[in-house]
């Protein structure tokens, strides 16, 4: 009986919650929550991605949404058991609303709800055709008018965007756009991806020669089609490019290559976009109801402007345009920046016999890849996690169940352990002059990524080259100007250079809205990315969720989708369900639409 005690606790709590919500007794429901509670909802109650922090916010949300949501049938998820450790009871849960089925995660403390995650799994009557409902494929029987699968796909490709319009247009065909389009395909939402490159996967292939994913394979699966079990831990850029190209074909995506989105505008009366694209040398006008910008966090380059750039006689380019090291053997290179791209490019240049200097203008968080995998990701995304029964879906939901408000409290001990383990490594870097940080509150890489999307390097070898002096370093300085053959730094140092690489990062995705739609719409939407943590590059006030990502924005029918492969996989589910509901005319009363505090 003892092993069933956690189940009994959770079942009793869920039963009480079910009864209170069904009866519309808000106070009774709210009393089931801890004072310092967190309820993170992915679409089910709020038609938004929203975290309620504390009882008052839970009460306010329920008061606004309960009548429309009609939640019921709360219980421990089928086939699951609750567990208990250190005074916290954990459980996977399931429930329904009037229009959907939900899945979630619960943490109980002292008999009350401490953290609650609710996510929309599917819309009733609009389930994905999987399992027993998978399509037959072959059509048995005799039919003189039979069309093959290939003929049907060719007909669809010829008609969509011409004789019939897509419901959704996705601008950007990297992993974000591809993952979302795959979800929408399964939900029967007519969708076209607009991609400027010649082939799917080119956004990876065309990056610098040495690029590999820094996240391990277990973290990077796409929806429906995980990587094979023999896939390398870290994917080389061309290999991941080929995988994305294959994925677009087998998932039957309508992917328009060599197509440039010229402009877009929204008609408030018809509630329809006009999207002008150029394809095969001719202009095509698309009329979707929904527009998704999946142009990527690493798509709009931040190109600095330094005095003398027009005088420099050597090669200079942003890291996104770096062709690789081959043509620079025996020459001198200066790389401005100290994050992932800067380190990768410096290491590749050194390997090719280039005299390379990194210019580090501000502190950078460094974490060794093996330490990150073992201590930071190992419990959720590793071969050990897989062998213990952890699935990608569960790992994603466990990560999602930690409210951003307190996530740093879970991350600080992780990075303290990494600092202790790799103390000698960090000492050698500091001795070489490298300026280190561990996040402004010591919470490390993940929080830095969520807050600002930059400021770190996952070390796969370049840090050792800096520590031993193979890669030269100038830190704590900025660029003053360029001359014909050199870079002059703010401390007066002159660095001779045949090549200057600006590894200076990328701008907000909001910039694409300004370019494609208008500055007015970009300002109306506001800054994209960040939590409002009031840390560097993430100004307050506190938002509690990523600004404008995967959820409704202040511009009707305009959405932003992107992030790393993990986020592209996980959040594509919830964005696709929001779009499907709107296509089907299902009411989607949005609660807590994000206010705009900062422009892009």
Regions found by a protein language model. Name each.
Residues 205-242, 363-436:
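Glycine-rich active-site loop/strand segments that organize a redox cofactor
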Residues 176, 198-199, 341, 364:
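Conserved Rossmann-like nucleotide-cofactor binding loop
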Residues 166, 189, 194-196, 237-340, ...:
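Flavin (primarily FAD) cofactor-binding/catalytic cores of flavoenzymes
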Residues 158-193, 340-350:
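N-terminal Rossmann-like FAD-binding beta1-loop-alpha1 element of flavoenzymes
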Residues 1-35, 153-165:
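Short, low-complexity N-terminal intrinsically disordered segments enriched in polar/charged residues
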């Amino acid at each position: 009986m003892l092993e069933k005690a956690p189940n009994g606790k959770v079942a009793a709590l869920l039963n009480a919650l079910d009864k209170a919500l069904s009866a519309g007794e808000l106070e009774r429901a709210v009393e089931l929550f801890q004072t310092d509670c967190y309820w993170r909802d992915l679409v089910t109650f709020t038609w938004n991605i929203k975290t309620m922090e504390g009882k008052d916010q839970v009460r306010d949300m329920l008061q606004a949404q309960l009548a429309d949501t009609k939640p019921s049938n709360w219980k421990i998820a089928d086939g699951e058991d609750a567990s208990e450790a250190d005074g916290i009871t954990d459980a996977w849960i399931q429930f329904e609303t009037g229009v959907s089925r939900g899945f979630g995660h619960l943490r109980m403390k002292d008999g009350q709800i401490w953290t609650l995650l609710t996510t929309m799994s599917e819309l009733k009557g609009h389930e994905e055709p999987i399992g027993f409902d998978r399509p037959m494929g072959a059509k048995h029987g005799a039919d003189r008018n039979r069309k093959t699968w290939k003929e049907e796909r060719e007909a669809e490709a010829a008609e969509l965007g011409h004789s019939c319009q897509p419901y959704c247009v996705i601008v950007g065909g990297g992993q974000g756009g591809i993952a979302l389009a795959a979800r929408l395909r399964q939900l029967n939402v007519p969708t076209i991806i607009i991609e400027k490159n010649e082939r799917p996967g080119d956004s990876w292939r065309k990056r610098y020669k040495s690029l590999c994913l820094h996240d391990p394979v277990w973290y990077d699966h796409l929806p429906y089609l995980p990587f094979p079990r023999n896939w390398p831990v870290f994917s080389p850029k061309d290999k991941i490019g080929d995988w994305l190209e294959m994925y677009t074909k087998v998932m039957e995506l309508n992917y328009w290559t060599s197509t440039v989105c010229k402009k877009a505008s929204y008609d408030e009366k018809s509630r329809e976009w006009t999207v002008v694209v150029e394809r095969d040398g001719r202009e095509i006008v698309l009329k979707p109801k929904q527009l998704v910008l999946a142009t990527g966090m690493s798509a709009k380059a931040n190109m600095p402007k330094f005095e003398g750039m027009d005088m420099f006689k050597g090669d200079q380019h942003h890291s996104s345009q770096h062709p690789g090291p081959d043509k620079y053997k025996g020459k001198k290179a200066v790389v401005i920046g100290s994050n992932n791209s800067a380190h990768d490019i410096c290491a590749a240049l050194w390997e090719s016999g280039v005299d390379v200097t990194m210019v580090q203008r501000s502190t950078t968080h460094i974490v060794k890849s093996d330490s990150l995998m073992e201590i930071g990701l190992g419990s959720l995304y590793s071969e050990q996690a897989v062998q213990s029964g952890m699935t990608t879906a569960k790992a994603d939901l466990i990560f999602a169940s930690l409210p951003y408000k307190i996530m740093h409290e879970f991350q600080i001990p992780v990075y303290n352990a990494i600092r202790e383990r790799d103390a000698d490594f960090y000492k050698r870097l500091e001795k070489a002059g490298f300026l280190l940080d561990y996040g402004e509150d010591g919470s490390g890489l993940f929080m830095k990524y969520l807050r600002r999307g930059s400021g770190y390097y996952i070390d796969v070898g370049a840090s050792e080259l800096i520590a031993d002096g193979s890669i030269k370093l100038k830190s704590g300085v900025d660029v003053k100007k360029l001359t014909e053959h050199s870079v002059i730094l703010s401390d007066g140092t002159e660095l001779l250079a045949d090549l200057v690489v600006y590894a200076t990062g990328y701008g907000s995705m909001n910039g694409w809205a300004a370019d494609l739609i208008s500055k007015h719409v970009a300002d109306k939407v506001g800054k994209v990315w960040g939590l409002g943590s009031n840390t560097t590059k993430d100004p307050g006030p506190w938002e509690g969720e990523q600004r404008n990502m995967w959820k409704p924005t202040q511009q009707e029918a305009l959405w932003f989708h992107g992030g790393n492969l993990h986020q592209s996989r996980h959040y594509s589910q919830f964005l696709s369900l929001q779009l499907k509901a709107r296509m089907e005319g299902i009411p989607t009363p949005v609660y807590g639409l994000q206010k705009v505090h900062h422009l892009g």
